[in-house]
Regions:
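Residues located in well-ordered beta-strands
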Residues: 25, 61-63
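Short, solvent-exposed secondary-structure boundary/capping segments
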Residues: 34-38, 70-83
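Hydrophobic core residues within well-ordered beta-strands of beta-rich domains
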Residues: 13, 58-60, 77
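Surface-exposed connector loops and short turns at secondary-structure junctions
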Residues: 40-44, 48, 92-93
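Short, charged, solvent-exposed linker or helix-capping segments at domain edges/interfaces
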Residues: 73, 89-96
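Short conserved beta-strand and strand-loop elements enriched in small hydrophobics
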Residues: 15-19, 44-58
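N-terminal helix initiation/capping motif
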Residues: 1-31, 95-101
Length: 101
């Protein structure tokens, strides 16, 4: 039996975004953060994230919580990025989007 340990609802997405000014792909999002796939790894745990949520542009401060390589044959990495502090507009916009999902 599999138990869901996450406390926040999340939504699968496939959207291009920027992490520290470099291209990455957003694969899922929750109120706490995002799951991102990229070909590169940031130099620091603290990153700047630029993304669009429900046609609104946001620049957020994030902290990389974990990194995993998808496959030895591919040069893609998955990163879990936590958003410790988000603007109220981001929280409201994402909350509306998640409630409709």
């Amino acid at each position: 039996m599999v138990y869901e340990m996450r406390k926040c609802r999340r939504m699968a997405m496939h959207q291009v975004m920027r992490v520290d000014g470099k291209t990455a792909v957003l694969t899922n999002i929750s109120m706490n953060g995002v799951l991102v796939t990229s070909r590169w790894l940031p130099a620091n745990r603290e990153v700047s994230v630029n993304m669009t949520v429900n046609q609104q542009e946001f620049e957020l401060d994030g902290v990389i919580q974990w990194v995993r390589r998808q496959s030895a044959s591919q040069k893609y990495h998955e990163m879990g990025i936590l958003f410790p502090n988000t603007p109220e507009l981001f929280t409201e916009t994402l909350g509306e989007m998640l409630s409709r999902a």
